[in-house]
């Protein structure tokens, strides 16, 4: 896609809509966006691409100020992502293809995690979040669903965690349960998830978690 502005700080991957259709849960498939979708373009960033943001590694003692700063950073990054995705969308529609953008959101329609995996931008680590072997934990910014046929990336089939248990040990709320050789993330015990889904009531009830499982990951430092 020569001529389409994509920031050097962003990761871009291409996934087959057919494979995402099979792997995503009901209600979060490409067909819930667009009939006859063929491709999903994923825009994301890894922690190493944010290494100039000191707060990403060292969360401040005042959660309110830290949370506001994080929100401001996310807003700016997603604002940049919207410009990029709109440019790609316009490029595709000018070529006669359909394209729909889906910005990141906790209540979004598309299965972002599965899209990241299929686009080769990360693998599921022990903590159930996506990890790029070089850039670290992956933050999805946006996706584009299109009926354009594209060359798809290959999922990464590697173990990025090995014997590391830092993310599991960092959670004091018991949000990870061992199932066989893997760990299962328990949403109702995750304070970050609760805070995002219920920001007013739970912010003061449980206290902050500050995504310690993600920040504990040593990859991409």
Model feature map: region roles:
Residues 1-73:
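Non-catalytic, usually N-terminal nucleic-acid engagement modules in DNA/RNA processing proteins
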Residues 23, 62-221:
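Catalytic cores of enzyme domains
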């Amino acid at each position: 896609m020569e001529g389409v502005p994509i920031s050097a700080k962003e990761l871009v991957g291409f996934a087959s809509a057919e494979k995402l259709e099979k792997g995503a849960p009901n209600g979060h498939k490409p067909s819930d966006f667009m009939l006859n979708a063929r491709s999903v373009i994923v825009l994301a960033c890894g922690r190493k691409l944010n290494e100039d943001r000191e707060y990403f590694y060292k969360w401040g003692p005042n959660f309110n100020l830290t949370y506001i700063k994080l929100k401001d950073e996310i807003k700016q990054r997603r604002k940049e992502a919207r410009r990029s995705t709109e440019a790609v969308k316009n490029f595709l529609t000018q070529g006669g293809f359909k394209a729909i953008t889906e910005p990141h959101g906790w209540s979004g329609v598309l299965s972002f995690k599965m899209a990241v995996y299929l686009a080769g931008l990360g693998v599921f680590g022990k903590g159930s979040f996506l990890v790029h072997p070089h850039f670290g934990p992956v933050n999805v910014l946006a996706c584009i669903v299109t009926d354009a046929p594209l060359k798809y990336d290959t999922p990464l089939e590697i173990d990025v965690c090995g014997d590391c248990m830092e993310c599991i040990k960092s959670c004091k709320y018991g949000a990870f349960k061992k199932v066989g050789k893997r760990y299962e993330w328990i949403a109702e015990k995750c304070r970050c998830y609760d805070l995002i889904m219920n920001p007013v009531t739970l912010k003061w009830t449980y206290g902050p978690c500050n995504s310690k499982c993600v920040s504990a990951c040593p990859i991409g430092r």
